[in-house]
């Protein structure tokens, strides 16, 4: 890995609103409407008032609204209550929770509890809200697990949708008492929240992609997102470290006019030129004979596509299959893109067959026992599985982040710097290892190659 750092340094050197009330609604659960249920009955079941239920679900206030079987209803907590790690409310009896568990309610705040805040669009009005609901549920599952180890938390969650003035949320009395906040989702909300966290010495975890450079000046920020430019640099450096001296690179033109990976392939070719590494160019439109002549018979070949999409990848697999049939002794590896994880259910055998490497910051391993266990708990707790639409899985992202940061705060308190060495936790999907940006905050520096080996096993090569 020492050479990886050398290559990375060399490359771097060379180169909609809701009302104010709705914006701060806090809710604790999501209820799936059953046949013949009424708004009154649901409110009574959870110990909330009908107006509180309506405020948490603005669609209910629209003229002509009818409660239908299968609708998802957001359940707020009553005003005198607070979230517990299991999503229940202090001072209120939740019939569903009572039926599931014999754990006693905690009427008073736990001593030395880590106070966790979540400020995200927690609603079911659009894709952003649904993703963040799943992410938040993952956080709750993590905090439940930590509770079994004696790590106590208090959770305060606010629905902060797009267009909301987050400063209104920050007026809530519990906000300034938090130890850590996860959020926001939208870039325009970052600065006021970051300034607030700095003023009250609260750790701020920005979990998803944002624009802006607040992390460069605010020491309370932990920014999970890495820029595309940074990830491209790391992907190129790891390619050079692993393949430059041992493999023959071949670039395949996929004729994809909407490709999103052109910057990577162009920059990689420039670096190979500077390093005086010979490579070949071919195309999916080439004849089999012309395609074959670009592959070296005396050393391994590494193939790079200029497209991240599934149809083009499938064409490449067909082309390589014909090549291997004609020249079975040819050694081939693929260097891909994290979008390929989405197609894993269809192409897994091909990934193994062609010794595939995928540069990424995460890997969703659905075959892992721990992953299966968490997915089963999620379904049991929330009555539905995690969405298959998202990779990385949103709930597992929330789970990993909560585990990492709460453990880090428990062990190190305010001195927690976000390094992997400070936290004894093996993530299910995403590793975290933060580095400081000057005198500002911290950015996740984790990077890995996920290697699908020809013996049908896998390895994570962490840089």
What does each model-found stretch correspond to?
Residues 17-18:
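N-terminal signal peptide c-region/cleavage motif recognized by signal peptidases
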Residues 2-8, 23-52, 56-463:
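Extracytosolic ligand-binding ectodomains
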Residues 11-14:
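Short, linear, compositionally biased motifs with a strong N-terminal bias
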């Amino acid at each position: 890995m020492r050479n990886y750092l050398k290559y990375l340094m060399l490359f771097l050197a060379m180169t909609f609103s809701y009302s104010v009330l709705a914006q701060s609604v806090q809710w604790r659960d999501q209820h799936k409407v059953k046949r013949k249920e009424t708004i009154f009955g649901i409110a009574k079941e959870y110990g909330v008032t009908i107006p509180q239920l309506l405020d948490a679900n603005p669609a209910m206030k629209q003229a002509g609204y009818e409660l239908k079987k299968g609708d998802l209803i957001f359940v707020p907590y009553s005003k005198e209550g607070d979230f517990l790690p299991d999503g229940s409310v202090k001072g209120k009896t939740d019939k569903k929770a009572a039926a599931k568990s014999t754990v006693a309610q905690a009427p008073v705040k736990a001593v030395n509890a880590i106070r966790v805040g979540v400020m995200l669009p927690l609603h079911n009005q659009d894709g952003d809200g649904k993703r963040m609901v799943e992410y938040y549920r993952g956080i709750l599952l993590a905090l439940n697990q930590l509770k079994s180890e004696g790590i106590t938390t208090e959770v305060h969650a606010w629905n902060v949708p797009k267009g909301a003035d987050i400063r209104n949320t920050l007026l809530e009395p519990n906000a300034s008492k938090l130890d850590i906040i996860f959020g926001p989702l939208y870039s325009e909300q970052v600065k006021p929240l970051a300034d607030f966290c700095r003023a009250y010495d609260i750790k701020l975890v920005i979990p998803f992609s944002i624009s802006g450079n607040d992390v460069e000046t605010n020491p309370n920020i932990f920014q999970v997102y890495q820029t595309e430019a940074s990830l491209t640099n790391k992907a190129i450096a790891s390619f050079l470290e692993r393949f430059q001296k041992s493999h023959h690179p071949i670039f395949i033109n996929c004729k994809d006019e909407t490709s999103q990976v052109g910057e990577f392939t162009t920059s990689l070719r420039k670096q190979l030129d500077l390093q005086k590494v010979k490579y070949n160019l071919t195309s999916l439109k080439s004849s089999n004979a012309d395609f074959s002549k670009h592959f070296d018979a005396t050393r391994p070949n590494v193939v790079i596509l200029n497209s991240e999409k599934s149809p083009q990848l499938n064409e490449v697999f067909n082309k390589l299959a014909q090549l291997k049939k004609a020249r079975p002794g040819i050694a081939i590896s693929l260097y891909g893109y994290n979008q390929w994880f989405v197609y894993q259910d269809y192409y897994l055998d091909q990934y193994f067959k062609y010794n595939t490497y995928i540069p990424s910051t995460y890997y969703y391993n659905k075959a892992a026992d721990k992953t299966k266990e968490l997915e089963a708990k999620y379904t049991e707790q929330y009555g539905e599985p995690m969405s298959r639409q998202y990779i990385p899985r949103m709930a597992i992202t929330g789970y990993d982040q909560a585990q990492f940061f709460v453990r880090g705060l428990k062990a190190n308190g305010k001195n927690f710097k976000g390094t992997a060495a400070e936290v004894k936790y093996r993530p299910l999907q995403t590793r975290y290892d933060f580095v400081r940006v000057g005198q500002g905050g911290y950015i996740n520096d984790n990077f890995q190659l996920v290697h699908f080996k020809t013996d049908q096993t896998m390895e994570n090569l962490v840089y």
